[in-house]
Amino acid sequence: MATKPDSRISWLQLLQRGQHYMKTWPAEKQLAPLFPENRVARATRFGIRIMPPLAVFTLTWQIALGGQLGPAIATALFACSLPLQGLWWLGRRSVTPLPPTLAQWFHEIRHKLLESGQALAPLEEAPTYQTLADVLKRAFNQLDKTFLDDL
């Protein structure tokens, strides 16, 4: 991460921003080698779907076999925390300002969108990874794939 994100954001807001960022980030193959978001989002979605049933299974298995409840609860809590860790990482990433090279690339893509006649809201502050995700998603939907040749 280039610079530190705003530390005044609460934990719950970070998780919500992470979920929004996960939904916004374009899952395009061309971006996978450049950004870890595709892998983190896929692992987080998998964890959201699989880990709660796994936690319940772990608890019921230990209770049914008369095992110790403490390790079963610890395992269940760890399994449920994995998707939260992914959402937290995505939330922190979404509010992180872009490094200078990515900011330049962001402005180039934004300029191409404006040249093609797309209406974009004016930037009020330094671009973050969330604004990059918004612009990339719009560029993949509206522009041809040649805008990626600059990478």
UniProtKB/Swiss-Prot annotation:
InterPro entries: UPF0208 (IPR007334). GO terms for cellular component: plasma membrane. It is a multi-pass membrane protein. It is found in: Cell inner membrane. The keyword Phosphoprotein does not apply. Keywords: Cell inner membrane, Cell membrane, Membrane, Transmembrane, Transmembrane helix. Belongs to the UPF0208 family. HAMAP family: UPF0208 (MF_01101). This is UPF0208 membrane protein ECA3038. It comes from Pectobacterium atrosepticum (strain SCRI 1043 / ATCC BAA-672).
